Amino acid sequence: IKLAKHAGMAVMDMYNKNIRPRDIMTKEAILNALTVDMALGCSTNSMLHLPAIAHEVGFDFDISFANPISEKTPNLCHLAPAGPTYMEDLNEAGGVYAVMKELADIGLLNTDCMTVTGKTVGENIKNAVNKNPEVIRPVDNPYSKTGGLAVLKGNLAPDGGVVKRSAVVDEM
């Protein structure tokens, strides 16, 4: 209930600041979201939700966007169920902001995007610190040099299928 109350307060704060959904949900913000997801190890659900959000704001997003972003985004976290660490560990290590700071430091995020805080991504992550490099690996020591998802195409999935590459064992 506490989280719901805080979410409601945040919505009202955005309303009072005249920050509208289309100010936040831009093409750049959606690509940032996919990049961060790749670094976190990903959820295949991202490839359902991000295109739907993009459609609502008039951005033609398709699953083929995943591979180029994955190829340049290091996988920095190995979270359960695919890995040994949990969301609580990520939070204690500096949270998503610390992951975003790692990515921004190598130019993988658009830091000018407006966020729900009323500040830009860059302003939000400016003071983020990675407190545990075993939970959030630095970009020069990732779990993998590529992001957590891959889109595969072939005779079984001519339009593409999504695999959570970060959960696949190396032998495969």
Which residues are covered by each model-predicted region?
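Catalytic or ion-coupling anion/metal-binding cores of large enzyme and transporter domains
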Residues: 1-172
